[in-house]
Structure formats: C-alpha cells, structure tokens
C-alpha cells in the first residue's frame, strides 16, 4: 500500500468514526464534546513530546488541562487569540528566510493553537454541527489532494526551509480539486452549492497554513512526526494540523454572523 493510500484509508476510517459520533448525539447529546476533549488531550500529549525536558512537557499538559475549567463566556477571547497566533506564525514563515523558535515560543504558540481550536470546535458544534463535520472532511481531502498533485506534478517548492514537501503545483491542485469535491458532496450533506465551493476555496489555504506552521514548529523542536499512531500520517497532529488551524477562523465567522442568518 502506498503512502497516499494509507493517508486516504486512515482519513476515511477516522471520518466514519466522526460521522457515527455526530449522529449519536440523539442518544448522547454531549458525545461530540467528549470526543473533542479526547482529541485535544491526544494532540496536547503529542505536542508535549516536542519539549526536551519532562518538566516543560508536564507543565504544557497541566496548562491545557487547567484551561478546560475556563468558563464558556470567555471562549470568544480564545478564538480571537487562536486566529491571531496562526496569522502571526504563518506571516513569520513567509517573511523570514529560515525562522526558528525557542522552547518558550513553542510552548506558548502550542497552547494558543490547541486550546482555542478545542473551544472553537465546541462553538461550531453548538451553532452548526454539520460545519464541524464539513471542516474535517474538507481538510482531509485538501491534504490528500495537495499530496497527490505535489507527488505527481510538483516542481516548484514553496517553502524549502520550513516545509520542503509543499509545492506550488500541489497547492494549486488542492485549490481546484477541493471546491469540486465539496460541490459534489453538497447534495449529500444538503449544503448550498455556491457556499460549498466558496468553503472549499477558503479551507485549502487554511489547511496549507496549518500544515506549514506545524512543520515549522516540529523543525524548531527537531521532530519529524508527532508520533507513529496513524498510518500514512504520523500522529494526530500530523492528521489534524489543517483542522486545528481552520476551526478558530470558522468559529470567529459563526460568532459574527447575524442571529437570523
């Protein structure tokens, strides 16, 4: 089985599990929230392994755990912080030739990416559960499409010092293929066609940014993969990096839509 086939198979299995979980809300209304908690803890554990000392790893995990006690009325602040940290890190990668991060930056950046993504998932689920599923499906497809087109046609590397596997051809291929895929999917998920196409055009660069930023952090920490739990991907961070980046932006959008939208 090729690496692409492994990536697609692993992604499909996890998406089926997610679909079952979301549909199980009729019997257990809080099961998606529990799932988000488990995923956040798994991602946090993998991220904690980026640190060279056990004390920093433990402190990071405790910080994430203690943050779950934050009252929900403060979630919007974390969503905004999450969007800002993603934008600042991605711009840093674009503007500087060979950026790097120290342990303190890795610590605070990780916290301001992972916890805001967790609360964003809760906000999205409570507002429009279908969007949570759509984000994960679209990111998984965009990631696989970029990998396929990059392997098949890739010639021009976009960020050789940060993420040498990312090519212009792969990004363009995903940017074209993802809206088409979501347009076909829109009939199955009862989604507006034009909305699905626009969504696909937005999700592709967000997924790309998530992948690149986590590659930057892993390179700074001298880590190749977050773990080896998921065939074809590596770990949960490697699988969900695009979703972790995308969720705060869509949560921010939902928070600012008119009530009767």
Where are these regions (language model features)?
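Hydrophobic alpha-helical transmembrane segments of integral membrane proteins
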Residues: 113, 176, 227, 244-245
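Interfacial loop-to-transmembrane junctions
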Residues: 55, 220-243
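Membrane-embedded alpha-helical segments of transport systems
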Residues: 142-145, 172, 210, 237-245
């Amino acid at each position: 089985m090729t690496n692409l086939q492994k990536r697609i198979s692993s992604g499909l299995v996890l998406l089926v599990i997610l679909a079952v979980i979301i549909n199980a809300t009729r019997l257990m209304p809080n099961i998606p929230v529990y799932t988000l908690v488990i995923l956040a803890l798994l991602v946090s554990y993998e991220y904690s392994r980026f640190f060279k000392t056990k004390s920093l790893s433990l402190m990071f995990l405790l910080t994430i755990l203690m943050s779950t006690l934050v009252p929900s009325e403060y979630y919007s602040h974390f969503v905004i912080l999450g969007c800002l940290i993603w934008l600042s890190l991605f711009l840093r990668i674009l503007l500087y030739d060979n950026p790097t991060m120290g342990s303190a930056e890795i610590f605070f950046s990780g916290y301001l990416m992972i916890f805001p993504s967790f609360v964003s998932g809760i906000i999205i689920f409570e507002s429009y559960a279908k969007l949570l599923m759509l984000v994960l499906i679209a990111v998984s497809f965009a990631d696989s499409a970029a990998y396929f087109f990059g392997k098949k046609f890739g010639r021009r590397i976009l960020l050789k010092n940060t993420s040498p596997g990312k090519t212009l051809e792969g990004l363009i291929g995903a940017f074209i293929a993802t809206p088409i895929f979501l347009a076909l999917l829109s009939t199955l998920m009862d989604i507006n066609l034009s909305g699905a196409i626009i969504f696909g055009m937005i999700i592709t660069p967000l997924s790309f940014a998530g992948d690149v930023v986590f590659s930057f952090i892993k390179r700074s920490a001298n880590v190749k993969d977050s773990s080896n739990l998921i065939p074809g991907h590596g770990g949960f961070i490697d699988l969900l990096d695009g979703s972790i980046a995308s969720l705060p932006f869509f949560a921010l959008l939902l928070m600012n839509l008119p009530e009767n939208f």
